[in-house]
Every structure is written in C-alpha cells, then in structure tokens.
Amino acid sequence: MKKLNYIFFSLLALLFATSCEEPQVENPVLKTPTSFVLNNPVMQKQYIELTPETTVKLTASQPDYGYAAAADYFAQVAFSEDATEWVEVNEEPYHDLGNIQLSGEELAMAMCKLRGIETEEGYTDEDARAVYVRLRAEIKAEPEKSAIVADVVVLEQVKGYFALKLPGYIYLIGD
C-alpha cells in the first residue's frame, strides 16, 4: 500500500509539471518605426545666448521598434521647419532619451555651418533667431530599416557665436 501511495503521488506531481501547450519563445523582431516624438523643451520661448558652457536639454520618446532597442540619437538643426538642409549637431550619438544635453559650442558650430561661415573674417554678429531642432534615430545593426526622424521643435531666440575650429599653426625654428 505504501508503494502505491508513492507511485500515485509521483504520477500526480508529474501531471502538474506538464502543460497542454509548449511555451512560446518569441525573439524580438525589429519593426520599421512609424512614430518618434521630440518633446517641446522647457527653454523653447526663452532667450538662449550660446557659450561653450551652455547646454540645451531635450527629451523624447523612444521610436516604436517593437521592443526596447538601444538606438543611437543624433540632433539636427536648421533655420526653417521645412528646410532641405539639416546639420547634425553631435558627432557622437546620444543614448539617453530622457536627458539629451545639446552643447552650446556644438549648436553654435552647426549654426555657423548653416550660415556658410568658414573663416572668422566671414562671421558677422546677428540678433537671436529661431533654430529648428529634430532628432534622428537609428540602430547600428540595421540603419536602413530603423532610421526615423522625430518631429521638429523650435527654439525661438538663440544667439550664436563664432565657434568653428580653425586650423592651428606650427612654427618651426631652423632652415
């Protein structure tokens, strides 16, 4: 009788350890994103005078890749919302969408590029102007399928400065 109890409880435990269906194992599949939202910055309507120490904070929501993907984010600027030429602000990508800090120096360099300024003599000081900002996101593994551009936000009063890095000189002594 004791052996029957062991056999019965073993079969009962085996019955509870099985299920009717196999667990579904799904690997995340990269979808082509359709929405990517850049939030309006807090300093949108304020006067921003760019210096090398200035930072402009942006936040955005992640593109809908179908899963939480680690994407690279690049900030782009232009002088009009429907511009055909956008200049990327950062060389190294951002990774944290909750805390994108645009450097004042990088933003001023992008503004100089948009104005076509290449030398210090060609720079003329101008009043604060509207600068349009958007983000570009992509995943390194599949940039063609994952690339998406966020909506455009405007920083209404941005005053730039001459921030282009000019080539230096090397002085040699001798013949």
Can you say where each PLM-predicted feature lies in the sequence?
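Positively charged n-region of N-terminal signal peptides that target proteins for export
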Residues: 1-5
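Sec-dependent N-terminal signal peptides
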Residues: 9-10
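C-terminal motif of bacterial Sec signal peptides marking the signal peptidase cleavage site
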Residues: 15-19
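Insoluble glucan recognition modules
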Residues: 21-76, 83-85, 92-175
